[in-house]
Amino acid sequence: MSLAKTPSIAAQAPVGRFHHSGQVAAYASLSVEGVEVAMRRYLGDGVKRVLVPMWLKSDHVSDQRGNPKASVVWQGTYEAGEASPTWLFSDEARDKGADAMLYSSRSRPELSHVVIFDTACLSYIG
């Protein structure tokens, strides 16, 4: 299955920056520049990628932009057997009924990303 043909599919990894324990999460950036920054660490893995324009429609979006604690490197903490500190923010947003959550890029805080908890809020616009 090509993910480019199903762009609103949730992350397949069992854990991520803002998902764990079977939670749904689809990750995206708000700009092409944000995508380039976010994907830099994955380039060179041989996976072909394409940009897919999407529209997020929701009245319930949590905003953690400007909160550096939501953008910390989480993998080391998780690999040490602890819960990711970033899960506090996504769990709280989910508990309050958010469909998605905005957050700042770790390496370029002026850029924003979004994690979508309910992929039904996404539609393809390309």
Predicted regions span which residues?
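Short His-Asn-centered micro-motif
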Residues: 28-30, 103-104
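Active-site and NAD+-binding cores of ADP-ribose-processing enzymes
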Residues: 1-21, 42-126
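Short active-site loop/helix that positions an aromatic residue
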Residues: 32-44
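A short, exposed loop/beta-hairpin motif centered on an aromatic-Gly-Thr core
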Residues: 20-29
